[in-house]
Swiss-Prot record:
Residues 150-161 have a biased composition (Gly residues). The gene is PDCB1. Glycans are attached at N154, N179. Residues 173-201 form a propeptide. This is PLASMODESMATA CALLOSE-BINDING PROTEIN 1. GO terms for biological process: callose deposition in cell wall. It comes from the Eukaryota. Residues 107-141 have a biased composition (Low complexity). It comes from Arabidopsis thaliana. A lipid is attached at S172 (GPI-anchor amidated serine).
Amino acid sequence: MAALVLSLLLLSLAGHSSASWCVCKTGLSDTVLQATLDYACGNGADCNPTKPKQSCFNPDNVRSHCNYAVNSFFQKKGQSPGSCNFDGTATPTNSDPSYTGCAFPTSASGSSGSTTVTPGTTNPKGSPTTTTLPGSGTNSPYSGNPTNGVFGGNSTGGTTGTGINPDYTTDSSAFALKNSSKLFICLLLIASSGFCSFLML
């Protein structure tokens, strides 16, 4: 029985640990985050959920919209190396950034409303498209003209950190709960392995 429980715990941990997301780095100005947001939304990210009256619009601040956009871009690129860089403004994470009412996708199929843009044509924003991954060469969030939040960013420099902490500046109760459940599972594994060795005596 203990072996069955241990096997199920290991399987659930293995399945959970494979997920990866992309979020904007903390400590960056709203202007930098807006440029990153605009780049991601203009190059294939599904930013529709960050539009008004959509599931990820609130909290309405640049950081939370940037997080959703870079993650969508990262998933659309198949979590490929370099697709979560954005010239150093984003970073991959294994901690799910989803929050109440806003689920961040973990795969390209998890993003809805995608559009295919043919390289060399114009995208819905009207600027030339590129096939270069963000953070490499001269194609970065800082080349081109930002659209001041057309795809959901708040370019007014509003307060970040509102709502239930989607900007990740401090640990929220959801992260604390997630981390405490990992600790509980680790303790359970240690206790069960000690229990199993005691039974073998």
